[in-house]
């Protein structure tokens, strides 16, 4: 892991291809993220909604094997900000 890469561990809910992460309001709509499960497997995803309480991430691959306790999210590519 890159020392400057922020990792989010507050995954609170998984529903189909959607992952809900608490305390991730600094993520931006459209940002590309890596989702890592407890075994180290990495999946890609994109932030599709951000609010004060949570961020919603669409996972590009299946979510089987992801669990709330061990899944982490890290930013790969942020979107341009004006």
Model-derived segments and their meaning:
Residues 1-7, 13-82:
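Acidic-enriched and Gly/Ser
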């Amino acid at each position: 892991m890159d020392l400057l890469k922020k990792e989010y561990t507050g995954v609170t809910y998984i529903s189909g291809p959607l992952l809900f992460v608490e305390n991730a309001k600094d993520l931006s709509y459209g940002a590309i993220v890596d989702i890592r499960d407890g075994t180290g497997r990495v999946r890609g995803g994109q932030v599709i909604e951000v609010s004060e309480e949570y961020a919603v991430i669409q996972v590009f691959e299946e979510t089987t094997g992801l669990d709330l306790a061990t899944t982490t999210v890290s930013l790969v590519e942020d979107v341009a900000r004006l």
